[in-house]
Amino acid sequence: VLGGPWQSADEIDFDALPEQFVLKCNHDCGGMVLCADKSRLDISAARTKLNWSLQKNYFWASREWPYKNIKPCIFAEQYMVDTNSSASTAQGLIDYKFYCFHGEPKFFYLGFANMVNGVKRDQLSFKNLDWTPAEFYRKDHEPFPFTLKKPRNWERMVEIAKILSAGIPFVRVDLFCINEQIYFSELTF
C-alpha cells in the first residue's frame, strides 16, 4: 500500500503520490482510478469518482453480507504492468478468479478489461483447472479474443487459492500473475 486510508478523496495529497499509482476503495467493485501518468490525470474527475464510490454499499444493493458493516475508505497501491504476459500489456492485467468450494478450487475465469474507443469492456473466459474451456459462460461478457498460455507458476496459484479458501463454504479467490510473481487481489463471498 502506497498511501491511505482516506475517508474522502479530498484528503488525498496527489503531489505525494508517485508518477504511477492505483487508487481504490476497499468496499466496492470498479471504484478505482488507474494512473499511468500523473501529469495527465484529471484530479477533479478522480476525486468525484472516488467520492461517489464511497457512497455505495453492496449490502443494501445486493445483500452481499461482507459489505454491511465495512467502513469505506480509499487507499493507494502500486501501478503494475506485466511485461511477460502473452496478452497485450497495453490493454491491462489478467485477473485469475478461482471459484472455491470448501477449500477446493473447481474452476476459474480469466478476467480482462479492454478499452475500446475510450469505453471499458470487460471480457472473461471460464476454464477448468486443466485450462480446458468450461462448458458454461456469461452471456453478458465477451470471451477473450486471444489465447493465453498457462503461467509457469500455475500450480502455486491453485495452491494459494486452496489455502485462502480453506474452511469457507464458498469464496472466489482473485489473484494476479505479474512478471511471474503472484499477487493477491481480493476475496469475494
Where would I find each of the regions flagged by the language model?
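A short beta-strand motif that forms the metal-chelation/ATP-contact edge
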Residues: 21, 100, 181-189
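Short acidic-glycine loop/turn motifs at beta-strand connectors
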Residues: 37-38, 100-104, 178-180
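A conserved helix-loop-beta module that forms one wall/lid of the active-site cleft
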Residues: 1-40, 45, 52, 56-65
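Short acidic loop-to-beta-strand element that houses the catalytic metal-binding Asp/Glu
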Residues: 13-14, 20, 97-99, 175-176
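Short, solvent-exposed loop/turn elements at beta->coil junctions and helix N-caps
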Residues: 4-10, 79-83, 176
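Anionic group-transfer/hydrolysis microenvironments
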Residues: 26, 79-80, 99, 176, ...
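Phosphate-binding site of ATP-dependent enzymes
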Residues: 17, 46-139
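A long amphipathic alpha-helix within ATP-dependent nucleotide-binding catalytic cores
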Residues: 69-74, 84, 123-183
